[in-house]
Amino acid sequence: KLWYNINIMKNFKTFLSEAEGKGLTMFDVDETMFITKAKVKVVKDGKVIKKLDNQEFNTYKKKAGEEYDFGEFKNAEVFNRTSTPIARMINKVKAILKNAVRAGSKVIIVTARPNFDNKKLFLDTFRNQGIDIDKIYVERAGNLGGGPAADNKKVIFRKYLDQKIYKRIRLFDDARSNLKAFLSLQKDYPGVSFEAFLAKPNGSVSRVR
């Protein structure tokens, strides 16, 4: 009888977790998990006319004849050496990852950067903070072209939503433009719960609706 009751309880718990569905949590990197130093150069007619930090790059719209130079943005050595971890957010990532993996949910990173020139060194920056980066896939929105970061990230958000396996999806990002792009997808996926969190420099967050 006891064995039967335990089995019923187990089945009920399984049912509850399936009813809630799987969750997807997405983290930005620059100014969300780490304070970073790399800049994107804006080049016109072979000359560097501007240098954009991460936050400026998020909202910059290229003008005619301008190209981006991602040299610093791709440099894993610069990222590894100069990035300062934001402790509260790093702890949040670790806690969410631990719970997510246990519950069958997923955690990914969505960065505005393209591929790094040294993948191992880039990933070691996370390992050095105790983050099990091998359980987190890193989506590099910078590979999708020279458009605004929010547009590129939106393509990635949609890719995961189109898998139709997530009932809850949340984003931690320091750029309102990225959070706005994320929330704009709600109308296309009415069966999914969206949560957007604005990351502050001290690692605290506030919900954006």
What are these regions (language model features)?
Residues K1-N5, E18:
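Short, positively charged and aromatic/hydrophobic N-terminal segments
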Residues E20-G147:
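Alpha-helical substrate-recognition element adjacent to the catalytic core
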Residues G23, K153-R176, F182:
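Conserved Lys-Pro-Asp/Glu-containing loop-to-beta segment of HAD-superfamily phosphomonoesterases
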Residues K92-I96, I156, A181-L185:
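A short acidic, amphipathic alpha-helical/loop segment
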Residues K119-L123, K154, L179:
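Short, surface-exposed alpha-helical segments at coil->helix boundaries
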Residues L123-D132, R158-K164, L183-V192:
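Short, surface-exposed basic-aromatic patches at helix termini and helix-loop junctions that form
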Residues R168-R170, R176-R209:
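Asp-based, Mg2+/Mn2+-dependent phosphohydrolase catalytic module
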